[in-house]
Amino acid sequence: MDAFVECTDKQLLYRLVHDEDERALDQIYKRYWRQLYNQAFKRLKHQELCEEIVQDVFVDLWVNRKKRNIEHLYPYLQTAIRYQVFMMYHKNKKLPYFEQPLEHIISIPPQ
């Protein structure tokens, strides 16, 4: 049995940050990926984008583990997902804005 299954979030964070233990990250991922995916999917309705967003949040957690001062793990992860979803909306809103005038110009018959 995996010893990390019984760990609290605070214990996992300690092992992640201070011990640099990848098994702690793996346990955090197993514990929360489904909830985070569902949170993203509720807003985006796109499987691949949501999987990518969740993966990015966990990669960021690992890469920046020493820089972050995380007190409460799950609320931190939820906030990170919301931010990534917001950024996805922001990034994708720009495209239709610039494409729309071109479609209008193209649809005008030549004179």
Regions found by a protein language model. Name each.
Residues 16-17, 36, 40, 50-61:
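Short, small-hydrophobic-rich alpha-helical interface motif
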Residues 1-30, 34:
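N-terminal module of bacterial RNA polymerase sigma factors
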Residues 79-99:
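Arg/Lys-rich amphipathic alpha helix in sigma70-family domain 2
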